[in-house]
């Protein structure tokens, strides 16, 4: 299980990027994420899945201040309140909707509303914290990715920022839990019903993966 310190929103703000991406790579990783995004305007609605304290959504709002709105999905109440405050300061409270929820648990989520879903170093850390085997982990990731797909309008895009396992870290399916490799992550996206899956940025184990909800789905 994750250390309880991660539940403290200020401690999380100080430590999350250093722990996940590393202080040397984090600025480039997140800058490249913003560069890979399509143009975002008043007709777009962004959903930040596992929003934490709103850092990733804040980068999007800074780059595209005219975006139509943001939904923040986060299970931790303190972090969600911090994220809401951050985004409201940039966009105004009327364009920010906080939703306290955990993906992968079959909860009630705002389906079919967003044009763009963003995920910032969420899936792999949660996967490690859940424990279980790699087989269990892949099944959970597919389930979560299917839920994220349901948040989007047909034709909407997902951009997922992750730190993945390297190919030589792969072990037995019934071995200790671990991060997915890039190939396993793209396979999970396809299994969850996504189209046009593509890695649009990679530096060693840092990746940004893009995928589309099929326009006809």
Question: Language-model segments: what does each one mean?
Answer:
Residues 55-105:
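Class I SAM-dependent methyltransferase SAM/SAH-binding core
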Residues 115-139:
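A short SAM/SAH-binding and catalytic strip from SAM-dependent methyltransferases
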Residues 107-117:
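A short acidic, Gly/Pro-enriched loop at the edge of an enzyme's catalytic core
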Residues 194-217:
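Core SAM-dependent methyltransferase catalytic element
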């Amino acid at each position: 299980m994750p250390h309880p310190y991660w539940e403290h929103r200020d401690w999380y703000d100080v430590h999350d990027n250093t722990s996940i991406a590393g202080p040397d790579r984090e600025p480039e990783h997140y800058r490249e994420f913003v560069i890979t995004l399509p143009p975002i305007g008043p007709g777009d609605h962004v959903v930040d899945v596992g929003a934490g304290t709103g850092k990733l959504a804040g980068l999007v709002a800074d780059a595209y201040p005219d975006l139509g709105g943001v939904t923040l999905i986060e299970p931790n109440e303190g972090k969600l309140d911090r994220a809401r405050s951050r985004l409201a300061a940039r966009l105004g409270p009327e364009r920010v909707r906080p939703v306290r929820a955990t993906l992968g648990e079959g909860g009630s989520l705002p389906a079919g509303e967003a044009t763009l879903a963003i995920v910032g170093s969420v899936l792999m850390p949660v996967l490690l914290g859940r424990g279980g085997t790699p087989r269990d982990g892949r099944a959970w990731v597919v389930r979560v990715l299917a839920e994220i797909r349901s948040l989007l309008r047909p034709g909407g895009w997902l951009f997922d920022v992750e730190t993945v396992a390297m190919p030589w870290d792969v072990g037995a399916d019934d071995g200790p839990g671990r991060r997915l490799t890039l190939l396993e992550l793209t396979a999970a996206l396809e299994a969850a019903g996504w189209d046009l899956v593509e890695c649009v940025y990679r530096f060693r184990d840092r990746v940004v993966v893009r995928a589309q909800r099929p326009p006809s789905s």
